[in-house]
Amino acid sequence: MNATPASADDLIVIGKIYSVHGVRGEVKVFSFTDPIGNLLDYKTWTLRREGSVEKQVELVSGRLQSKFLVAKLKGLDDREEARLLSGYEICVPRNLFPDLDDGEYYWYQLEGLKVIDQLGQLLGKIDHLLETGSNDVMVVKPCAGSLDDRERLLPYTEQCVLAIDMAAGEMKVDWDADF
């Protein structure tokens, strides 16, 4: 395990180690990618946890097991050593992500955008997104200059999202501010 070469601003969290698996140093991983197995496409991970030094690790192998992944990391052969990685976020540099088609966005690109309704009222900023099964949901939290102090949950659908202007850092939505 080495120090990480990528800057912290360049790293995107794609999963989290949450437990150990077996006695040979494998770890259980919760993947934030869709499909979840895409996390295994990235062979070098930067691990980080608040209050700890970032570590760079190499993925040797991995497999899907039920609703989580099991990963084998290079040089990690002991269950107790693997347990020490529990709670670490798995990050990769954003430049490794595949390019998307026009009009498609990664969640990290949407986080922080100002959300403005059709009347020009600032509803807040996108804090994060949730996967609900039927559609993704944007968690919009109040910010300086927003209409009120309410947190809103807006569907990330064609009916709700009218336009996204990445250069301006804004998203126009069809949403009643009272809802």
From Swiss-Prot:
Membrane-crossing residue ranges in chain numbering: none
GO molecular function terms listed in the Swiss-Prot or TrEMBL record: ribosome binding
Cytoplasm as UniProt keyword: yes
A single GO cellular-component term on record: ribosome
InterPro entries hit by this protein: PRC_barrel-like_sf (IPR011033), PRC_RimM (IPR056792), RimM (IPR011961), RimM_N (IPR002676), RimM_N_sf (IPR036976), Transl_B-barrel_sf (IPR009000)
Keywords of this entry: Chaperone, Cytoplasm, Ribosome biogenesis, rRNA processing
Domain notes: The PRC barrel domain binds ribosomal protein uS19.
Similarity comment: Belongs to the RimM family.
Role, per record: An accessory protein needed during the final step in the assembly of 30S ribosomal subunit, possibly for assembly of the head region. Essential for efficient processing of 16S rRNA. May be needed both before and after RbfA during the maturation of 16S rRNA. It has affinity for free ribosomal 30S subunits but not for 70S ribosomes.
Protein name stated in the entry: Ribosome maturation factor RimM
